[in-house]
């Protein structure tokens, strides 16, 4: 019998073990679709980004007009740009849902997979931030100024660090050129980290909604989940195309249609919607260093999830009290996102402070306590 190339060829064997014959739990729900959706998002972003980079000029005098030129004169340039800009929003929707799934179903107990995932999130945030600066509109310029300036809160080396990052004494041409270089480089770093993330995942196999081992009744990934993922792709591309074709500027800031002007500060400087929750936490502390630390903690707190798991059950499927807290946390993040988009005035200041406090309280105190309480109730 002729050897099966899919199982004998070194490269094909690797692909086969990752995407075709991969043993998968039979009961994973649609919440497990987001990993593959993130992969498709990354591929879409790299492709559209590459096409945009061919027409972009990383120079303060030309950046804004080169983007306008892409939209006006390049064949389907407007579509490529709209897909790239809105694709970033979809990327973040998928990654936040992916993380939410991880918290709900206790996937963070696969520590290596979880930690590489958080590093992926941080890299994605950095990529999105430097990318937002490239069109060189008002919000691009001032967003870059405000966010990079936060590093000056670091004692002793802060100011030097910021000037080193800027390549001068303010955000200017050197800043734009290096941000373009970084924005081109980081997605490939994300792709590399994704492979590491998957390697760790395939060491242990996927978790499932029951949080119990499913080794005895696993099914092959293809055709079952390859088909299920295909449905996910279609359901994701539908809102992306709708956004890009009907309301491409819905999630953008009107301020960015004005070319960058260092002499005019926009009335409300705010980042893209996917950073607003962290921005609200940053603003809710009336001290620069304190705010920066809270901002960092808002994402880095995820590293503590495996250590704060006190329940004897892995998932929240059969833990109604923890479920209540989880959905409170989700609502809390939505409130923070809304507050981050509002001006710094009453009542938004106090709402933001309370929401920030409850965000950390739920994650650090209430969830572990509830896990322990549920153990007690169930006589574990």
From Swiss-Prot:
Cofactor(s) in the UniProt record: heme b
A cellular-component GO term for this protein: respiratory chain complex III
Pfam family for this entry, one: Cytochrom_B_C
GO terms for MF: metal ion binding; ubiquinol-cytochrome-c reductase activity
GO biological process, one term: mitochondrial electron transport, ubiquinol to cytochrome c
Binding site for heme b b566: 98, 197
Cell compartment(s), UniProt: Mitochondrion inner membrane
Record keywords, A-Z: Electron transport, Heme, Iron, Membrane, Metal-binding, Mitochondrion, Mitochondrion inner membrane, Respiratory chain, Transmembrane, Transmembrane helix, Transport, Ubiquinone
PROSITE patterns noted in UniProt: CYTB_CTER (PS51003), CYTB_NTER (PS51002)
Cofactor notes: Binds 2 heme b groups non-covalently.
Transmembrane segments: 34-54, 78-99, 114-134, 179-199, 227-247, 289-309, 321-341, 348-368
Membrane topology recorded in Swiss-Prot or TrEMBL: Multi-pass membrane protein
CDD domains given in the database record: cytochrome_b_C (cd00290), Cytochrome_b_N (cd00284)
Binding site for heme b b562: 84, 183
Binding site for a ubiquinone: 202
Family to which this protein belongs: Belongs to the cytochrome b family.
Function: Component of the ubiquinol-cytochrome c reductase complex (complex III or cytochrome b-c1 complex) that is part of the mitochondrial respiratory chain. The b-c1 complex mediates electron transfer from ubiquinol to cytochrome c. Contributes to the generation of a proton gradient across the mitochondrial membrane that is then used for ATP synthesis.
Note: Heme 1 (or BL or b562) is low-potential and absorbs at about 562 nm, and heme 2 (or BH or b566) is high-potential and absorbs at about 566 nm.
Subunit structure, interactors included: The cytochrome bc1 complex contains 11 subunits: 3 respiratory subunits (MT-CYB, CYC1 and UQCRFS1), 2 core proteins (UQCRC1 and UQCRC2) and 6 low-molecular weight proteins (UQCRH/QCR6, UQCRB/QCR7, UQCRQ/QCR8, UQCR10/QCR9, UQCR11/QCR10 and a cleavage product of UQCRFS1). This cytochrome bc1 complex then forms a dimer.
Annotated protein name in UniProt: Cytochrome b
Organism: Falco femoralis
